[in-house]
Amino acid sequence: MQNKIVKIGNIDVANDKPFVLFGGMNVLESRDMAMQVCEAYVKVTEKLGVPYVFKASFDKANRSSIHSYRGPGMEEGLKIFQELKDTFGVKIITDVHEIYQCQPVADVVDIIQLPAFLARQTDLVEAMAKTGAVINVKKPQFLSPGQMGNIVEKIEECGNDKIILCDRGTNFGYDNLIVDMLGFSVMKKASKGSPVIFDVTHSLQCRDPFGAASSGRRAQVTELARSGLAVGIAGLFLEAHPNPNQAKCDGPSALPLSALEGFVSQMKAIDDLVKSFPELDTSI
């Protein structure tokens, strides 16, 4: 199977290319924090030679509680994104939830993301595809890896073949997620070789059945990320925070920003090793 390459400026995203780090924070908490987090990622990835894309949401529209922080909104969020691009020269990925958001967001950022809970909403998928932007599709927690092929087809039917697929875990009973490492190759096959990335942060979520916010398993972020890269994928999706215990969203799953360099260094070593192996022919 031929691996497709999705280009984001001078970055090649493909399953057989060096992994790309899609890293940042869960939600924009402030302009200053976004600058701090982005600068930390840029310094680490430039030092280690890892391709990098900044990620954050301007609106967490699917929070469990009506009282939870959602973000600064689209208008203010896009101003922050533009400043990050102007200051650090980074590429940016963010999610959209409404049809009217698609074009204005695509005019500023480099990748627009289709949220997992909305991935089968055809009108939204079509509106995103018609912007011509690169699209990152989050696999819904309730969908099998093979079913991602249908979402890819919707996007391609609109004339857009710049597609990245992202696994963020699968429902395992109530209030728990697991990651099927065999699912990455299934998604590659279902999409005829599209780049597949792994959202290690959100795969660590663990819900409190009676609570208003998700818990998480931060202590296992390294082992889960290592496992994902070991199967040969295009990138990792990671959230880090200066103080995860004070984060306004998903802090229990976020990597401490102080641990970023050690984490990325390990991931690069694993990715380099895995992609140095020749592909084995196991057919009969």
From Swiss-Prot:
GO molecular function terms noted in the UniProt entry: 3-deoxy-8-phosphooctulonate synthase activity
GO biological process, one term: keto-3-deoxy-D-manno-octulosonic acid biosynthetic process
Keyword set, alphabetical order: Cytoplasm, Lipopolysaccharide biosynthesis, Transferase
Superkingdom in the source lineage: Bacteria
EC assignment: 2.5.1.55
Catalytic activity from the UniProt record: D-arabinose 5-phosphate + phosphoenolpyruvate + H2O = 3-deoxy-alpha-D-manno-2-octulosonate-8-phosphate + phosphate
Compartment(s) of residence: Cytoplasm
GO cellular component: cytoplasm
NCBIfam families per the UniProt record, alphabetical: KDO8P_synth, PRK05198.1, PRK12457.1
Protein name as annotated: 2-dehydro-3-deoxyphosphooctonate aldolase
Lineage per the UniProt record: Bacteria, Pseudomonadati, Pseudomonadota, Gammaproteobacteria, Pasteurellales
